[in-house]
C-alpha cells in the first residue's frame, strides 16, 4: 500500500473496561508492506514512514485517567504536551480498594520530547533514542501504611528494565525544572508526612533494557534538587542492567538543612 491517510477524526476504542479516545486525529503512513510469516500464523507489518498527530487523547485504567493535550509522533521524533495521570478516586477511597500497600500517583508534565529512531510496528520492534526530555513535571506519590504490608519481593530498577521485552536504549534522558513530593501516612499519624524535592533536575545516561548484544548496560544517574525547599541536595546513582545480582551504588549530599526542615515529614507522627 503506497499511502494511507486519516484527517481530523474522532475515534474511541472501547473494550468495555479501558476506553482509549482520540480527538482531532490525523495520521499518514507511506509504503506499507504486509507479508505472511514463514514460521507463525498471521501477517508481518512494515511501514517505511508515518506521521501521527492527535489532541486531547485520554485513556482510563483501573485507578487513573491518563491524558495528553497534544501528541505528535513520527519515526524520528515525539512531542507530548500537557501529559497528566490523575487518580480516579480520593486517597480514602483508594485505601479501601487495595488489599495491600500500594503507591497512588498524581503526575503531570508540561512537555515530553524524544529524538532518535524506533520501529514500533514491525515484528522486530526497537527503541533507540538519542535524547528524551521531560520539562516541568510535577509528581506526587502517596502511600498509606493502613493496608497490610505487601510481602512480595520488590524488583529493583535494573530488573524492571531487563523485563522490557524489546531492545531499548535512551542515550540521554533529562528531567528539568520539576517537583517530586512523597507523602506517607500510618494508622496513628495525624495526616501524611511529606518530603519535598523541588527544582528537581536529573540526567540519566544509557537507560537500556540490556537487549542489544555488545552494547554497554551501565546506567548513570545524576540528580540535583532542593530538599524541603531549604537545602541543596545532589545524588549520584548507578547500576548495571545486565547484572543479574542487581547491585547498585548510590550516594548523596545535602548541606545547611535545619533540624526543623524535616518537620513536615515527622510532625504528623508525633502525639
Please give the residue ranges for each predicted region.
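Elongated, acidic membrane-bridging lipid-handling scaffolds
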Residues: 1-80, 118, 141, 154-250
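Surface-exposed extracellular loop regions of Gram-negative outer-membrane beta-barrel proteins
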Residues: 85-93, 257
